[in-house]
């Protein structure tokens, strides 16, 4: 009986049938977009201009394809992040607009920096601030096209001026807090037990993200303990936003912030004791859009520096898709820049896809062996996500089509198996 090593046509047909039925259109672990209406916010790993500051002038420090540098769809600054620019004097004017928003930043404010507002403060409080900031930011950018950072002016009728309360130097990084602004104690007051107010106006944006912060604990000054309390009062609507100190602690005391989404209007900042704080910067949100989940790429150092998972905590379904690798960050330019795994994730920005989902991006919109979870776009076997519900509304037609195709695949497999068995029996009989 003759024998051949080549794959018989019928065997090849069987393999292709199985591959089509069980491995077609798998989700890709990338960030991508459905069309050209997208924008990326980043740091040095996507800052095309940073090459001018380097001794080794090549683009290996970036995790994006250099071809994207001329796209006009990136706002990024080496050494910075949206959180740093929002709170500190180290400022970059992050500005961008798009329907599909991608974030790849945050690593420049981690436990490696170890920021503390007070000498005996607690960096964990600031990690909590970071998580709350990005939670509000991601949720809002699922509903708005445009993001920018703006300054806020205020009017204070007292004689005291702004004071620097929070400054920290670590690992060569100096950070000075300037949002919110602290108003100093009036010289006519013997202590901090007095009420003070300042006026500020929010205008020019659809919504504003502003900080409301207190020292959550017993603040000691001149042998007296103070319970911090801060309020923002909307003069136009009568709505009062408040944040009070609730912890009975004296050590590990640090500034704790919540992040409010305020509408345009006239506001009064109020303090009942301790220092009055006034927002000096805001995230300006403009141009409402249909609900579109944002995409976040994990932003972390090589393991020789301490990182955090605050952006992962902030990025939750259904408003956010989180993308990550399973290995350590290991750059080629240096240990913290140019990682192959993250470059692979960002490579999805070079092309359009049909569908974005929890599992990844689907290139095609017909049939997939993986059922898209929390899908957005033209997705295989599923229609667009319905917001306000943690489940997907599915179009029955693709489901029927999938069932028909799977049924055909099963019939083909059964037929081929029967054919092979019959053919083998004939061959054995002839042999």
UniProtKB/Swiss-Prot annotation:
Positions of transmembrane segments: 400-420
Residue numbers spanned by region Esterase domain 2: 275-387
GO terms for biological process, alphabetical: fusion of virus membrane with host plasma membrane
Residue ranges annotated as Intravirion topological domain: 421-431
Virion surface side: 22-399
GO molecular function: host cell surface receptor binding; sialate 4-O-acetylesterase activity; sialate 9-O-acetylesterase activity
Disulfide-linked positions: 48-69, 117-166, 205-284, 213-257, 315-320, 355-379
Xref: InterPro entries: Capsid_hemagglutn, HEMA, Hemagglutn-estrase_core, Hemagglutn-estrase_hemagglutn
Catalytic activity: N-acetyl-9-O-acetylneuraminate + H2O = N-acetylneuraminate + acetate + H(+); N-acetyl-4-O-acetylneuraminate + H2O = N-acetylneuraminate + acetate + H(+)
Keywords on record: Disulfide bond, Glycoprotein, Hemagglutinin, Host cell membrane, Host membrane, Hydrolase, Membrane, Signal, Transmembrane, Transmembrane helix, Viral envelope protein, Virion
Main localization category: virion
Region (Esterase domain 1): 11-131
Subcellular location: Virion membrane; Host cell membrane
Enzyme category, top tier: hydrolase
UniProt record similarity statement: Belongs to the influenza type C/coronaviruses hemagglutinin-esterase family.
Complexes and interactors: Homodimer; disulfide-linked. Forms a complex with the M protein in the pre-Golgi. Associates then with S-M complex to form a ternary complex S-M-HE.
Function in brief: Structural protein that makes short spikes at the surface of the virus. Contains receptor binding and receptor-destroying activities. Mediates de-O-acetylation of N-acetyl-4-O-acetylneuraminic acid, which is probably the receptor determinant recognized by the virus on the surface of erythrocytes and susceptible cells. This receptor-destroying activity is important for virus release as it probably helps preventing self-aggregation and ensures the efficient spread of the progeny virus from cell to cell.
Stated name of the protein: Hemagglutinin-esterase
């Amino acid at each position: 009986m003759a024998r051949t090593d080549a794959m018989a046509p019928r065997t090849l047909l069987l393999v292709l049938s199985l591959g089509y039925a069980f491995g077609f259109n798998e989700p890709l672990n990338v960030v991508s977009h459905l069309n050209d209406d997208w924008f990326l916010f980043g740091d040095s790993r996507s800052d095309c201009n940073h090459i001018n500051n380097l001794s080794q002038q090549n683009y290996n420090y970036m995790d994006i394809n250099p071809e994207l540098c001329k796209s006009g769809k990136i706002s990024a600054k080496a050494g910075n992040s949206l959180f740093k620019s929002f709170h500190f004097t180290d400022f970059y004017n992050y500005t961008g607009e798009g329907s599909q928003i991608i974030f790849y930043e945050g690593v420049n404010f981690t436990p490696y920096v170890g920021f503390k507002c007070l000498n005996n403060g607690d960096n964990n409080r600031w990690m909590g601030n970071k998580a709350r900031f990005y939670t509000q930011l991601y949720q809002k950018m699922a509903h708005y096209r445009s993001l920018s950072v703006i300054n806020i002016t205020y009017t204070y009728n007292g004689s005291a001026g702004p004071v620097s309360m929070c400054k920290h130097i670590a690992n060569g990084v100096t950070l000075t807090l300037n949002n919110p602004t602290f108003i100093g104690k009036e010289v006519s007051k013997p202590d901090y037990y007095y009420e003070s107010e300042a006026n500020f106006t929010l205008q020019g944006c659809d919504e504003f993200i502003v900080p409301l912060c207190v020292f959550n604990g017993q603040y000691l000054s001149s042998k007296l303990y103070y319970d911090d309390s801060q309020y923002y009062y909307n003069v136009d609507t009568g709505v009062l936003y408040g944040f009070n100190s609730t912890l009975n602690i004296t050590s590990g005391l640090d500034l704790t912030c919540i992040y409010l989404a305020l509408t345009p209007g006239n506001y009064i900042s109020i303090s009942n004791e301790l220092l009055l704080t006034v927002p000096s910067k805001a995230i300006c949100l403009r141009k409402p859009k249909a609900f579109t989940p944002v995409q976040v790429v994990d932003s972390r150092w090589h393991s020789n520096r301490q990182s955090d998972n605050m952006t992962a905590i902030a990025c939750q379904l259904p408003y956010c898709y989180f993308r990550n690798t399973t290995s350590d960050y290991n750059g080629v330019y240096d240990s913290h820049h140019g990682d192959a795994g993250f470059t692979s994730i960002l490579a999805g920005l070079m092309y359009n896809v049909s569908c974005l989902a929890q599992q990844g991006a689907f290139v095609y919109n017909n049939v997939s062996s993986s059922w898209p979870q929390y899908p957005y776009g033209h997705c295989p076997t599923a229609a667009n996500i319905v917001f306000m519900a943690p489940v997907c509304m599915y179009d029955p037609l693709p489901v029927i089509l999938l069932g028909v195709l799977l049924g055909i695949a099963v019939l083909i497999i059964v037929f081929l198996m029967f054919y092979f068995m019959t053919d083998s029996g004939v061959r054995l009989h002839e042999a």
